[in-house]
Amino acid sequence: FTYVTSPLNVPTIIEKNQGIFEKTFGDMGIEVDYAELTSGADQTQALASGDVQVLYAVGGTSVILSAANGADIKVLNMYSRSPKAFCMYSKDESLTTPESLRGKTIAGPTGTNLHELLVSYLATAGMTIDDVNYVNMSIPDAKAGLDGGSVDVALVAGATAYNAGQQGYHLVADGEGL
């Protein structure tokens, strides 16, 4: 099983802390071990390589991309959808439309719900990822790039998104309605 600690994954945290899977699967003679993997790309790679057998709290985008690349993945269940938890933040308050992002440097993790958010947002204006300078990096690195001024927009989620809002950064868009 994968274990994702992000606050977006409260069911995962409760399940692990209460030992629900250990008890349920243990009753069937199946041992449960956890691998702490925090990105969907890492989770699907671990599944494809056989390092883990179950992904828990993985983003749909990562699963779709992995399956499209030939991974044998079966979706058994979903427990949430939180479009407002996936955000694009900037220091520049003039970035209010997809068109205003043209040529801007936007950083975030490729192959994730955040990447899908950006692509979907740009598509509302007939734009593609090629219309921006997209840089693949982790959520913490994207936020650090925004803090330091090396990126114009950071794709963030969970506590990092909350903190960006608390710092007064401008919410360009979230996943609501996309």
Predicted regions and their residues:
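A local structural motif
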Residues: 22-36, 51, 123-136, 145, ...
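Pocket-lining segment of extracytoplasmic ligand-binding domains
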Residues: 61, 134-135, 140-178
